[in-house]
């Protein structure tokens, strides 16, 4: 599959979450039954990233018993044009449509599409998520710094309306900037470890928590400081759309509550109850 990635022809979606299995991913129900040289997939996924434009989806499905939880999951690669696959885009409040709902109606997939060993899909998923939670944090930090500079320039424009009444501009912008510096300082170590081929543990959860807080603080600052300009007019449309999207950052890729639970368990060694 590497040539299609290098040429830009390959685009894969991530089929993890379900309606009843989001933060508790190990509760997923999408089923993969072995029949001869194939797996037969039945079930559905939601919030599948880029499924509408993807040519393949790496799917986390249950090959074990329902009570097997994470020990009974397998990762299987599916082509979106296989018979029985239906993709429906999900339009978000932000206006974006990068997520989709996917239905699998007895989709027959060659057993050679299994990634890793049967029953070990959880380990594959966690390996992938460390990149989503960590490398993504480093990338987004750069984007958010650029957006903060754009906001600062907008507020500094002498021809623009004054900031919202009572807004302590320097204090708000300074606080957001310090949060972004903390995110970069935390995530750079994670990115270096990933680049060196090392496995990242709960550090990725810390990166994910910081990213969610920073993402929302940047756009909350825009909403607060721009005042009425934020709510009306085409000039602020991008800010409004990005503010809506920032609401999801403490949910997607593992909610903030889940990340705190990982840190509490694996770093702080707190009791389960």
What are these regions (language model features)?
Residues 38, 42-88:
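A short core secondary-structure module
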Residues 124-127, 131-134, 226-273:
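Glycine-rich phosphate/cofactor-binding loops in nucleotide/flavin-utilizing enzymes
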Residues 20-28:
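Active-site-adjacent elements of ketosynthase-type condensing enzymes
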Residues 8-17, 60:
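A short, Trp-centered hydrophobic/proline-enriched beta-strand micro-motif
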Residues 156, 160-164, 170, 181-237:
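C-terminal helix-coil-helix/basic helical segment that borders enzyme active sites and/or dimer interfaces
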Residues 46-51, 93-94, 248-255:
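Glycine-rich phosphate/pyrophosphate-binding beta-alpha loops
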